[in-house]
Design a protein with these regions (language model features):
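Sigma70-family region 2
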Residues: 25-26, 65-80, 99-101
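Structural recognition of an alpha-helix C-terminal capping motif at a helix-to-coil junction
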Residues: 45, 59-66, 79-91
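N-terminal module of bacterial RNA polymerase sigma factors
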Residues: 1-42, 49, 128, 135-136, ...
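Acidic, proline/glycine-rich intrinsically disordered inter-domain spacer in sigma factors
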Residues: 116-149
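Short helix-capping/turn signature of helix-turn-helix
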Residues: 38-41, 49-52, 163-173
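Short, Lys/Arg-enriched C-terminal cap helix and immediately downstream tail that follows
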Residues: 77, 97-101, 154, 159, ...
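Arg/Lys-rich amphipathic alpha helix in sigma70-family domain 2
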Residues: 74-76, 90-119
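Helix-turn-helix DNA-binding module
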Residues: 145-185
């Protein structure tokens, strides 16, 4: 489920939201509305798993689609549309993550403190079905929190690769293309990240 708060970019442009995208629409036959509907959950999910905060992920997702809107003419079809969008999303989310880390190093608020002081901003509540029992809902929330905690233990590059492979289900080739790194680098990052997660799961 994708949050309702994310909306299409509002920019002054000769291209309306229903118009075919220059450079993208001409190749794949999608309007911007259709592209947004197809990829918004993917972009938000990636940003959320990297950042761990609903509002931050919403902000990043807005930035991503605004960037797509502005850069639509640069898409040449040399990669798949999905990996092109992933590349933009990873870059934006990673930049936001590094920004939080810089604040932490300066002695200002950390992302972890921000989350703990704003629990109502967690996405977990949006994924909890009203049909669930309170016990099941609590268990699912605890499981999500544990996954998020373990992912937060990974270095950023490993975290991104593991998320793209094990959560989003991308192939190694798609990840390599999205991150603009070699296939061997992708496999190494995922293997190392999984090893760290395995140690955490085993309580080591």
């Amino acid at each position: 489920m994708f949050p309702d708060q994310l909306s299409l970019p509002k920019e002054d442009s000769v291209m309306t939201q229903g118009a075919i995208l220059d450079g993208i629409g001409s190749r794949i036959g999608l309007t911007f509305d259709e592209l947004f509907e197809r990829y918004n959950s993917m972009v938000f999910g990636l940003a959320y798993h990297i950042l761990g905060d609903r509002e931050e992920a919403l902000d990043v997702a807005q930035e991503v689609f605004l960037a797509i809107y502005r850069k639509m003419g640069t898409f040449r079809g040399e990669s798949s549309l999905k990996t092109w969008i992933y590349r933009i999303a990873v870059r934006r989310a990673a930049n936001r993550f590094r920004w939080w880390n810089r604040l932490r190093r300066r002695g200002t608020v950390s992302l972890e403190e921000h989350l703990s002081k704003n629990p109502e901003r967690e996405l977990a509540r949006d994924y909890t079905s009203k049909a669930q029992s309170p016990e099941d809902a609590l268990l699912r929330q605890e499981e999500r929190e544990e996954v998020k905690r373990m992912l937060n233990e990974l270095p950023l590059q490993q975290r991104v690769a593991v998320i793209m492979r094990d959560i989003d289900g991308l192939s190694y080739e798609e990840i390599a293309e999205s991150l603009n790194v070699s296939l061997g680098t992708v496999k190494s990052r995922i293997a190392r990240g999984r090893e760290v997660l395995k140690h955490h799961l085993n309580g080591q």
